[in-house]
Amino acid sequence: MLDLENIIVIGVSHENLSLLERENFMRTRPKYIIERLYTEKKINAYINLSTCLRTEFYIELNSNIKAKEIKNLFSVDMIVKSRVEAIEYLFKVGCGFYSVIKGEDQILAQVKGAYAEALENEHSSKFLNIIFNKSIELGKKFRTKSMIAHNALSLEAISLKFIKSKFPNIEDKNIFILGIGELAQDILTLLTKEQLKNIYIANRTYHKAEQIKKEFDIVNIVDYREKYPKMIEADVIISATSAPHIVVEYDKFVAQMKENKDYLFIDLAVPRDVDERLANFKNIEIYNLDDIWEVYHLNSMNRDKLLEDYSYLIDEQMEKLIKTLNYYK
């Protein structure tokens, strides 16, 4: 039986925890904790939506554990929603209500990715399948009708704006990218359109860097173990790795850096890749995800109006979902 009583969402995001708090939370290995509950059959199913701004678990409960008990497994302030409220929350997440850039497309792709991963690893359920399919369907419809994503700024586009504010003429600048995940590749796509001649990438797994080289012939591969000599020659260092620790270490960078050269770091990792003490140097600037959130939150008023005007689509989708669930009773 598909019972709304069994649906909860639990997690953290940039809206309820700071970057530092989210970093500490990720070090507790939350996915392992939820996976253990699933393995022990204390929950029926789960889907993990994990991005640079949020880590959330959409869970179908059973009689073996309560939402409060799951929350108590974690030591941080968690988002906990249940029943209709949990589903409405997912719908709004998929539509971009809680994104840094309201209505941006990337979150919908991430919802799709989370759902696909759950299907592949066989820890979803019929109930969660219905809910996530409805969310993805709504996300597409919402953007089409509201046109909220028209000329939308993505994280990578925002990063480029920060770079251009520091270096208006970036064509002759050296760009060094650490990590080649999805976000780093999106940034690389934008940078290649700027007629840059000097782009370097370093990744812990070398063959993955070689694959990127095939797609972006303009890039130069740097051995990850030899990253510092090339990094200190760069004007802009973009770091977006998935490492659980500092990647750009204070002592190693300071020992080799040029004091008469300006450096701009764009740190898009959670936990952060760049030792924040480097910002104490006058010739070094560091922007991280919280900086992006702070700056662009001020420019979201127009998008907020669109969210309000088209929120009726969420109500309509919820009605359709209830009808679907009633059909299976």
Swiss-Prot record:
Binding site for substrate: T51, C52, L53, R54, S99, E104, D105, Q106, Q110
Amino acids binding NADP(+): G179, I180, G181, E182, L183, A184
Catalytic site: C52 (nucleophile)
Broad class of enzyme this protein falls into: oxidoreductase
Pathway assigned to this chain's UniProt record: Porphyrin-containing compound metabolism; protoporphyrin-IX biosynthesis; 5-aminolevulinate from L-glutamyl-tRNA(Glu): step 1/2
GO molecular function, one term: glutamyl-tRNA reductase activity
A matching Pfam family: GlutR_N
InterPro entries: 4pyrrol_synth_GluRdtase, 4pyrrol_synth_GluRdtase_N, GluRdtase_CS, GluRdtase_N_sf, NAD(P)-bd_dom_sf, Shikm_DH/Glu-tRNA_Rdtase
Superkingdom classification of source: Bacteria
GO biological process: protoporphyrinogen IX biosynthetic process
SUPFAM superfamilies: Glutamyl tRNA-reductase catalytic, N-terminal domain, NAD(P)-binding Rossmann-fold domains
Keywords for this protein: NADP, Oxidoreductase, Porphyrin biosynthesis
Catalytic activity: (S)-4-amino-5-oxopentanoate + tRNA(Glu) + NADP(+) = L-glutamyl-tRNA(Glu) + NADPH + H(+)
EC annotation from Swiss-Prot or TrEMBL: 1.2.1.70
Record-stated family: Belongs to the glutamyl-tRNA reductase family.
Functional note: Catalyzes the NADPH-dependent reduction of glutamyl-tRNA(Glu) to glutamate 1-semialdehyde (GSA).
Record's miscellaneous remark: During catalysis, the active site Cys acts as a nucleophile attacking the alpha-carbonyl group of tRNA-bound glutamate with the formation of a thioester intermediate between enzyme and glutamate, and the concomitant release of tRNA(Glu). The thioester intermediate is finally reduced by direct hydride transfer from NADPH, to form the product GSA.
Record comment regarding domains: Possesses an unusual extended V-shaped dimeric structure with each monomer consisting of three distinct domains arranged along a curved 'spinal' alpha-helix. The N-terminal catalytic domain specifically recognizes the glutamate moiety of the substrate. The second domain is the NADPH-binding domain, and the third C-terminal domain is responsible for dimerization.
Quaternary structure and partners: Homodimer.
Name of this protein: Glutamyl-tRNA reductase
Organism whose genome encodes this protein: Fusobacterium nucleatum subsp. nucleatum (strain ATCC 25586 / DSM 15643 / BCRC 10681 / CIP 101130 / JCM 8532 / KCTC 2640 / LMG 13131 / VPI 4355)
Gene: hemA
